[in-house]
Amino acid sequence: MAEKPQQKAVASAAKQLAKEVVKLDKITKSNGKQHPQKNVPARKWRPRQAKPNNRRVTHKIKRELHKQGLEGPASRFRVTVSATIGKVGPNKEQGPELQIATFLHPSLVKEPNDGSNFGPLQAAAAQWGLWRISDLEVRFTPLVGSSAVTGSVTRASLNLTQSPGATSWGGLGARKHLDVPTGVSKVWKLRRGDLTGPRQTWWVTDTNEEGGQSCGPMLEVHGLGKTTSTYKDSDWTGDLFIVELHGTWEFSNYNAKPALGMLERVTDQTNVELGVDTEGQITMTIPENSPMARHMGERFERASASNASSVGETIWQIVDEGAGLASSVAPAPFGWLIKGGWWFVKKILGRAANAGSQYLVYASLADAQNGKPAMSTSRGYVREVKQTILSSTQLNAPNTGPGASQPALAAYEMFPYFPHGEPAVGQPFYLMSTVSTGVYREAMPVWVKYNYPGAPSNQAPFEVTIGQTTYQAQTYFKLTEPVAYGADIPEVTSEVKPALNGWYTLDTLPAIGTFQAIFTLPGTKSKYGDVVAASHFSITPQLMLVAYLVRVTTALPNALRGSPWSDNADNSILYYTPLVNAYAAATSDANPIQFTPNRACVSECRSHCGHPTIVAADVGEYILALVWCRGNGFSAGVINSYGALADTSFNLDSLRADSNGVMTLLNRAVPYSSLCALRMTRGVPPTSDDELVARILGQLQTRLKFAAGSGSSSEDDLSDDDDFECLRSTPLQQIYEGVRGLRGHAEAVAVVKSLQSRGHAE
């Protein structure tokens, strides 16, 4: 039967539709495999797909994160700095040894012994309340080549917990770390994600806040393996690396707290003693007068009206850089804490300081802030003192504002202040020391006159030579570690306050004369020292005492040798007592001692007073040679109209004020030592008038640009050696001062007379 027309039309349409579906399916599959069709021309009208803009995408992501508050406030201030945080030294043992442990807080990133120096990071930390690190590089610069040492490797690791732990070498490797072979330069790059803070990537700047919110990550550097030298069979003693940080710190939320910019850091070699107190708390004790104890002293603590024992508020991070404290010297069960190499302490206030400064030990920063010291189970722990190198870092300041204690905090930085430089020529300085009488008999000080046969009369066993003139010294005094300082101290009450202006060393002072002595008779005098400074006191217009500071160059013996010192039959050696008021001796209470107030004498001792004792002095030590003589003037160590004394008694109408302190040397009895302070002057007198005139003219030509080659007016081109310095204490220096003020021509004689009339000449 034939098909109907309608059925044929439907079948044809279905067949055509099936062909289109198969065709479309082939095209879809072909486009999915991205196979180019052969013999099919490309469609020029089809647009290419645009590549994504990574910069735009990053910007959109950051904007979205900022909208959702995931990154906190925007950065308001950025500082990029390079800071040295320490050196990596050699390993003394095989096990891991801590070399450096430092927080990355901007107030704490500073060099060892940097004190409270105010750098750009510290300045920013004192002004902003939030901080973070955008990028950081830890640079290891080798200080020795790889061929010179062997046996050690260094590992830097990042500790994000703000507390030490019992970490092995494998445990350090489980952290984010970098291994540095010896002698190789390395750079460790850390990104923001490694250093992000807990407050939407920010850290709090105030270290009085919770430690986990403020101090930031901890960078630790350990060494493994004993460091030995390849050049000789011995341990290596030098440093291996210098470690520097180079990074960018960002800050936000302005909140000024000046004290946070002055947190201190000190490294010192000291004795450390770990112990357990009566309550079972672990304590650390260091010597009271050590630099470390002064650094961690009570000046940072709040003043308390009570004298009861308490614990300070300032927290200190202690790092055992010397690896001198082994776990065996720590009370159980905290041997791991000491072995880890760093911990926290607070000072114990109000306790007796006989045994040293004591501190409570804490195992973490959080424990220190919450007042939970490490407790020991070893109540019978035996204390043991060990010497090591400790690094102490101040982590917080109880007073963060510019309070009254702040100036004292800043002023403290000048101490300890070590001597440097020399007192200027002609400018007075003060000498302070304990003194021991050089010549004495039991409790009586002795002066000696020396009239040995064949020698001039009125001589002494000691003498000082300045230029061409020799002065006889009747005794001397030994100084113990003398100190020299410059100060402006008014002689009378005035509105001008005393001021300290120098702290000098004596060892480099040039000699202005020589000191000779004789200790063995018969014999001749020989040189025993150099004279470097002098002081004087005029008792009357014609009578004076002069003290010369002598640096010993040949050791002084401890005894006088030779029979003439004690067997004084020919009366060649005379012994005297120091200056006293004249008196008439009494034999009973009915006839008391009678003094003559206006008459002083140097009393002669009986010949049988016995062999005197002398005090020895080693090379490099200092003595004071005392000259009792006639003279009417004194300048730069030179005594004008000098004359040796033959008389022993003098009339005194009035006693002048002794502003130089020379009379304090005239003690009536010999103590073991006494404290003495002298006002002295150093100076080099010219050897002749011709030389003086030539030096003055030469200096005038140089300063007034008369000399050849002196055309430059820069002060840097002038010589550091001032020829006038040696003349400032001489009367002729005053001549120059007078000439300098004259406009016209004047003869020298008229200038001298003019100065004398004005009272400038001595």
Curated annotation (Swiss-Prot):
Family matches, as Pfam families: Astro_capsid_N
Bias kind Basic residues: ranges: 41-56
Record has Cell membrane as a keyword: no
GO cellular component terms, semicolon-separated: T=3 icosahedral viral capsid
Stored InterPro entries: Astro_capsid_N (IPR004337), Viral_coat (IPR029053)
Keyword vocabulary terms for this entry: Capsid protein, Clathrin-mediated endocytosis of virus by host, T=3 icosahedral capsid protein, Viral penetration into host cytoplasm, Virion, Virus endocytosis by host, Virus entry into host cell
Site (Cleavage): 305-306, 354-355
Membership in a protein family: Belongs to the astroviridae capsid polyprotein family.
Protein name listed in UniProt: Capsid polyprotein VP86
Organism whose genome encodes this protein: Ovine astrovirus 1 (OAstV-1)
